[in-house]
From Swiss-Prot:
Organism: Trichormus variabilis (strain ATCC 29413 / PCC 7937) (Anabaena variabilis)
Entry EC number(s): 7.3.2.2
Oligomer and partners: The complex is composed of two ATP-binding proteins (PhnC), two transmembrane proteins (PhnE) and a solute-binding protein (PhnD).
SUPFAM superfamilies per UniProt: P-loop containing nucleoside triphosphate hydrolases
Subcellular localization: Cell inner membrane
Stored PROSITE patterns: ABC_TRANSPORTER_1 (PS00211), ABC_TRANSPORTER_2 (PS50893), PHNC (PS51249)
Record-level GO cellular component terms: plasma membrane
Name of the protein described by the UniProt record: Phosphonates import ATP-binding protein PhnC
Keyword Transport: yes
Keywords, alphabetical: ATP-binding, Cell inner membrane, Cell membrane, Membrane, Nucleotide-binding, Phosphonate transport, Translocase, Transport
Phylogenetic placement of the source organism: Bacteria, Bacillati, Cyanobacteriota, Cyanophyceae, Nostocales
InterPro entries assigned to the protein according to its UniProt record, in alphabetical order: AAA+_ATPase, ABC_transporter-like_ATP-bd, ABC_transporter-like_CS, ABC_transpr_LolD-like, ABC_transpr_PhnC, P-loop_NTPase
Amino acid sequence: MSDYVIECHNLETAYVGSLNRPILNEISCHIKQGEFVVLLGLNGAGKSTLLRSLVGLVPLVKGEVHINGVAMNSRILPQIRRDVGMLFQGGGLIPQLSAIENVLCGRLGTRTTWQTLFGFPKRDRLLALELLEQLGLRELAYQRTSKLSGGQQQRVAIARALIQSPQILLADEPTTGLDVIATQQVMETLAELHTQQGMTVVAVLHDLGMAARYAQRAIVLDAGRIVYEGSCDNLQAQFVVNSQ
């Protein structure tokens, strides 16, 4: 059995006329179980597109994505999306709902209409409360998310991603729009999931210092191609070299 939980083989998306190239162009990379990997690059490099392709949210014209050794296809996509938690840029919460209700939304994909018609099962609600408690938000469980701070909202979004008990967590610019304190709280949460629970974390970041502090490995993209893959040491030099 492969040591890799994520494998990308020659991924290519459709040609984009405004860019004169595909957004992703012959992308191949591998991520091991329990790694914390960051995707870096300038705006438009293809970071978020690559991340979303890992859960079938981006159509590919060429290449394959393998999750846990299985090639992604429409038949197994629902299972893959249960195994892979996704933290979208901005959180994607419903502001009118409470924190716990937003977390429970993460269960909608595995519950039938009849199961949710009269509310979520008690075990789901208990799990949601447990996750919020682990993230320091137990006392805010019934507060509308619109009244929470940016950092608190992002931690609610993390809890929502975790309610499926995923093996892998994908985070698309999880600190965008957050202040320094909230940014640190979110990154510490991701780091704890990695170090304490052995979760595989793949995050799109812009802050090179943050990447070097928390991640084990970096994948740097430029114009839809991987230009560096390796240690997070001296990442600034990689951007200087690749811009010349």
